A protein has these predicted regions:
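Amphipathic alpha-helical scaffolding segments comprising HEAT/armadillo-like alpha-solenoid repeats
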Residues: 1-6, 28-40, 62-74, 95-105
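N-terminal low-complexity, intrinsically disordered segments
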Residues: 11-41
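Structural detector for internal amphipathic alpha-helices that build alpha-solenoid repeat scaffolds
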Residues: 15-27, 50-62, 81-93, 114-123
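HEAT-repeat alpha-solenoid elements in large eukaryotic scaffold proteins
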Residues: 8-18, 41-51, 73-78
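Residues at alpha-helix boundaries and short interhelical turns
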Residues: 27, 44, 76-80, 94, ...
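Short linear sequence motifs
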Residues: 12-14, 86, 104, 108
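Context-gated lysine
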Residues: 6-7, 11, 79, 106, ...
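Acidic, proline/glycine-rich low-complexity IDRs
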Residues: 98-123
Length: 123
């Protein structure tokens, strides 16, 4: 990432530019990923692009991007107050996550927090 890229990303108003940068430079972002996530967390007030970035990185390589995905999920929970986007994260715990709600809620704090927000009486 060069200084021109950083200048461009500093003008990101909602997270879309940062998300696009991640998607378009996926093969070379490892060293800048923390910076990119910090930038996205700063500008994405709704959590929309944070959720998209978490899903994208998970789909590319869940193990390699585990820490980044975890940070993004935590940020999405905080940002998405209207719960418009965080529900899209639940399938990250498997297509059958609904069959394992109790177990996942006990073992994964992010899953528990998302599920509790979406289904406040479900746990």
């Amino acid at each position: 990432m060069n200084e021109d890229d950083k200048k461009l990303l500093s003008k990101d108003s909602d997270g879309l530019l940062t998300y696009e940068y991640i998607a378009n430079h996926i093969s070379s972002i490892d060293d800048e990923l923390d910076y990119l996530i910090d930038n996205m967390m700063r500008v994405d007030l709704s959590g929309q692009f944070i959720v998209s970035a978490a899903r994208y990185l998970f789909a590319i390589d869940a193990e390699h991007y585990n820490n980044a995905v975890s940070r993004l999920i935590t940020a999405a929970i905080e940002k998405d107050r209207e719960h418009r986007y965080i529900g899209d994260l639940l399938p990250l715990w498997g297509a059958d996550y609904q069959d394992h709600v109790e177990e996942l809620s006990k073992t994964d704090n992010n899953f528990r927090r998302i599920y509790k927000r979406l289904y406040p009486t479900g746990i």
